[in-house]
């Protein structure tokens, strides 16, 4: 801002040339020093002005003036009607200083000082008219979209165009006008910026930036409350807004959060927030955006819920290439869910308007405008730089307040470069030689940069850098001020930005390769020191600096940290990108133990997002963990050997390759015994116990699961991340409940399942709760408790739908549909079981397929589709033979016997073994023999496994058949032997039925 302009904010007018503040038409009296404080704050609007800076600027030669700013601020607030706790104009920033926060409108005065006339002002913050000539239609369209948003119809607008076409100027002018009434209009404006080089790897970068800025502003506590209530997974990504204790709690509870949940949460926040205020959300430079941000844009755009939301995204069409934004934008635009506002060059009339505004006293605009329009094709950036160049060459000059063109427009032609690039390069060459190194180093630091970063690149004092940058800002040459940063080590540094990314790119191209490498490395090292323990927050940025600085080992290290950040946000594609880039960096390093260790860390981590994006059966998952295992054996690091083995174990276990999974589990256990860390043994016992359970080795499974549970210390392991995201305690208790039921301890099984549910609820950990609910629903299914099965399955499905857990949703669907068939519902439930099975397999899961096929077959039998049921059972046995999955084998043989009778014995009721009312024809001998063979096979398998509950159920089926054959003694002997073993669970359906049959048999024998 120049020193003699008139500035308006709200109803006030600050007349700088006449040193006067007016409220409406009335002057507002202020002491000279108080006016000077207001002037300084307005001149530095939007950035933090420290108390020390104010004292230096307003009281430069006065001792003991440290308390003077406070008095002036109090007087200003009284004069402006402002409140410290709810500021509209002047915000107190902690103990540091003040910030002027009201939107400003500048009235251009014709009498400007000569030096200010020579150089264009900061076009990022300048008044709308000079930079927005010719954009009235586009501006009006944005305002129409805002009006529709204010009435509850969400709007999404993509502002597109080539570099320099004026996207940012248009949007900034619109936002300034939209917020001109201040927040009393009920409009909140959030801004986020995508960053070149590392922005594509930072999940939700512009969204988190916008939310963080909005929630951190005074008076915006509403948003923080809504984040706590509706979007804890987002709040966990904004550590500056919460205490360390709250952050730790959030991170623990949010392990395993899914992308679907994050999208749902932000949708909930937008819905709740926009019932209170209207929200304008700007995301700039989406051509550098990440996958997750694009997913969010799609989700927000496609939602049909009312919301007072206007989302504006800017991007360069020419820079899209194969960026994923291209198909996303095409999809939304083709369905009319978003609108595009493409910017072309401005017209010759608009060029003339610009000249008349910029040079208020002149007579050349009509002659010069067509020529400038032809030269620049209406590109605003080219136009402004060309005019700057004409002023610098004094072809446009001022005398006695009048601007004149010293040559005819045609005489300028030979001096105009062929494009804006050449023109900017001419301007760069005119920069004083002593200032050029500062701009070169700044360009390596980024489009926006901290003075401290440039100081580290040049090994200079930051004060000197700030002086040089401020000199360029005053001249409005390439740079503008952006505010003040405070780094974690307490470093306070001014932040600057290039007026346009093109300037930064051209200055960066001037830097020789060797110097560029040194600059990147020094900047990375300085930021690394300053961030200390919080260095992970800028991992993606550091990865770029060290990569460009040829420090490949450190670059790979920060790619790993950036991948971990991405995984915390469930951004699996970004995590894969970081990890693959890290592995590529390591290929440039010699084969050393350190390199091997780094690759091992990356490969172990890579398996997680690969599984999430490609499924359990993906060969890429196996390759990652196999390579990790090879590397871990080279470095002989026990913990990492176990991690790699567990990764492979999960891969083969979920695929149903149980013999391989068993071997891996045994190796895990063997390795874990060599390490003092109990969590390794806990995981190894759990993995082996789970595997043995499905192999039908129930006693051994129980032993391992109990040992795993004995090692589990909730206090110690609550923050421990194991091979998956299920809490270790829940992961032990739930399968242990199954093992106990199979072994004939139904009461103990129910108790352990209840403990798993209680622990999952206590942890408030959704994935663990989904695990516990699914296992509990299946346990009720084992127990023939249809109502409880349905209730638990419906709870599972609700949680899985809300959180985005496809595995639990598929299993819940199968179990609920089975229960509904058992309770008398129709054939549509059979289709739902099939759909659940298809969804289950689509994830890449095979484990448990035999059990689900058995449930489907049983439901077919219940609905009278016996032949279909028998075909499904044949499929289940084929799967069991291939995988070794034997947990449900006895039940499959029993069901085969029941369905055989149902098919071949008229009137047979498989659920009771009784005949339908009416005549009871004798059963064919061959049918009886076939059914007996299946029942006896079921009993034999159950006895081999010591699966008393499966044995009891098979014995009930066979004894009912023998009752029909009048083999009462044999039936009684068989069933009483099995029933007599049980010591608990006598109120469960199977044991109650067995007791009823035994009483019937006894009565028959004594009759």
Where are these regions (language model features)?
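Short amphipathic alpha-helical recognition elements used for nucleic-acid or partner binding
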Residues: 26-58, 436-437
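P-loop NTPase Walker A phosphate-binding motif
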Residues: 162-200, 205
């Amino acid at each position: 801002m120049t020193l003699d302009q008139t500035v308006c904010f709200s109803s006030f007018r600050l007349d700088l040339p006449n040193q006067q503040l007016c409220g409406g038409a009335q002057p507002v009296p202020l002491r000279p020093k108080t006016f000077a404080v207001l002037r300084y704050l307005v001149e530095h609007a939007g950035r933090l002005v420290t108390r020390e800076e104010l004292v230096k600027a307003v009281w430069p030669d006065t001792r003991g003036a440290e308390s003077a700013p406070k008095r002036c601020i109090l007087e200003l607030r009284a004069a402006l009607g402002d409140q410290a706790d709810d500021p509209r104009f002047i915000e107190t920033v902690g103990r540091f200083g003040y910030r002027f926060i009201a939107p400003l409108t500048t009235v251009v005065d014709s009498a400007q000082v000569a030096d200010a006339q020579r150089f264009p002002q900061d076009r990022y913050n300048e008044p709308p008219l000079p930079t927005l000539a010719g954009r009235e239609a586009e501006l009006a369209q944005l305002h129409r979209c805002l009006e529709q948003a204010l009435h509850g119809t969400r709007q999404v607008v993509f502002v597109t165009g080539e570099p320099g076409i004026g996207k940012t100027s248009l949007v900034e002018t619109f936002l300034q006008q939209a917020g001109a009434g201040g927040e009393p209009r009920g409009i909140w404006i959030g801004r986020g910026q995508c960053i070149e080089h590392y922005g594509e790897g930072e999940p939700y970068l512009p969204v988190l930036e916008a939310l963080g800025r909005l929630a951190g502003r005074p008076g915006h506590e509403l948003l923080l409350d809504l984040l706590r209530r509706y979007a804890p997974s987002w709040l966990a990504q904004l550590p500056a807004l919460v205490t360390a204790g709250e952050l730790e709690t959030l991170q623990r509870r949010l392990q395993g959060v899914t992308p679907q949940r994050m999208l749902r949460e932000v949708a909930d926040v937008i819905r709740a927030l926009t019932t209170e205020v209207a929200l304008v959300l700007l995301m700039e430079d989406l051509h550098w955006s990440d996958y997750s941000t694009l997913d969010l844009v799609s989700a927000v755009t496609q939602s049909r819920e009312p919301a007072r939301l206007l989302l504006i995204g800017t991007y360069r069409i020419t820079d899209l290439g194969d960026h994923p934004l291209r198909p996303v934008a095409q999809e939304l635009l083709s369905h009319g869910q978003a609108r595009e506002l493409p910017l072309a060059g401005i017209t010759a009339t608009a060029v003339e308007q610009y000249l008349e505004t910029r040079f208020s006293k002149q007579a050349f605009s009509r002659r010069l405008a067509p020529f400038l329009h032809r030269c620049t094709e209406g590109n605003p950036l080219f136009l402004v730089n060309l005019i700057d160049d004409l002023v610098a060459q004094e072809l446009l000059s001022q005398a006695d307040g009048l601007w004149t063109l010293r040559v005819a427009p045609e005489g300028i032609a030979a001096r105009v470069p062929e494009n804006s690039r050449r023109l900017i390069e001419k301007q760069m060459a005119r920069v004083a030689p002593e200032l050029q190194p500062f701009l070169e180093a700044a360009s390596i630091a980024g489009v926006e940069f901290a003075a401290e970063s440039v100081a580290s690149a040049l090994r200079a004092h930051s004060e000197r850098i700030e002086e040089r940058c401020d000199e360029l800002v005053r001249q409005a040459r390439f740079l503008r001020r952006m505010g003040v940063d405070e780094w974690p080590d307490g470093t306070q540094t001014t932040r600057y930005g290039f007026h346009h990314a093109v300037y930064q790119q051209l200055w960066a191209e001037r830097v020789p390769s060797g110097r560029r490498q040194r600059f990147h490395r020094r900047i990375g090292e300085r930021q690394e020191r300053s961030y200390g323990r919080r260095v992970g927050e800028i991992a993606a940025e550091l990865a770029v600096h060290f990569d460009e600085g040829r420090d490949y080992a450190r670059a790979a290290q920060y790619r790993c940290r950036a991948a971990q950040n991405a995984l915390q946000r469930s951004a699996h594609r970004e995590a894969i990108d970081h990890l693959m880039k890290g592995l590529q960096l390591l290929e440039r390093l010699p084969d050393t133990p350190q390199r091997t260790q780094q690759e091992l860390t990356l490969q172990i981590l890579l398996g997680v997002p690969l599984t999430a994006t490609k499924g359990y059966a993906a060969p890429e998952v196996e390759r990652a963990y196999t390579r990790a295992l090879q590397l871990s054996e080279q470095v002989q690091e026990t913990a990492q050997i176990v991690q790699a083995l567990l990764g492979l174990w999960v891969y083969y276990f979920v695929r149903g390759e149980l013999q391989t999974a068993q071997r891996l589990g045994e190796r895990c256990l063997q390795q874990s015994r060599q390490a003092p860390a109990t969590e390794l043994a806990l995981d190894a016992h759990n993995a082996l116990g789970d595997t043995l359970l499905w192999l039908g080795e129930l006693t051994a499974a129980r032993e391992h699961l109990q040992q795993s549970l004995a090692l589990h210390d909730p206090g110690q392991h609550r923050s421990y991340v194991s091979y998956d995201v299920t809490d270790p305690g829940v992961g032990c208790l739930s399968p242990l409940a199954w093992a106990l039921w199979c072994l004939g301890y139904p009461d103990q099984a129910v108790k352990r399942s209840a403990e798993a549910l209680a622990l999952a609820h206590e942890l408030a950990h959704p994935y663990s709760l989904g695990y516990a609910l699914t296992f509990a629903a299946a346990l009720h299914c084992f127990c023939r408790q249809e109502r409880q099965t349905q209730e638990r399955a419906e709870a599972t499905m609700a949680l899985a739908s809300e959180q985005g857990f496809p595995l639990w949703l598929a299993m819940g669907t199968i179990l609920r549909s089975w229960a509904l068939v058992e309770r008398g519902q129709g054939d549509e439930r059979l289709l739902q079981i099939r759909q659940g099975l298809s969804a289950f397999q689509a994830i890449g899961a095979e484990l448990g397929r035999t059990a689900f096929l058995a449930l489907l077959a049983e439901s077919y039998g219940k609905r009278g589709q016996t032949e279909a049921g028998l075909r499904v059972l044949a499929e289940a046995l084929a799967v069991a033979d291939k995988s070794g999955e034997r947990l449900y084998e006895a039940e499959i043989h029993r069901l085969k016997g029941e369905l055989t009778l149902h098919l071949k014995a008229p009137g047979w009721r498989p659920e009771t073994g009784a005949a339908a009312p009416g005549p009871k024809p004798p059963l064919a001998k061959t049918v009886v023999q076939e059914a007996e063979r299946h029942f006896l096979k079921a009993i034999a398998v159950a006895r081999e496994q010591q699966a008393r509950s499966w044995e009891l159920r098979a014995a009930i089926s066979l004894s009912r058949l023998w009752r029909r054959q009048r083999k009462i003694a044999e039936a009684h002997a068989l069933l009483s032997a099995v029933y007599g073993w049980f010591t608990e669970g006598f109120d469960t359906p199977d044991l109650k039925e067995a007791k009823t049959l035994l009483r019937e048999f006894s009565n028959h024998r004594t009759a």
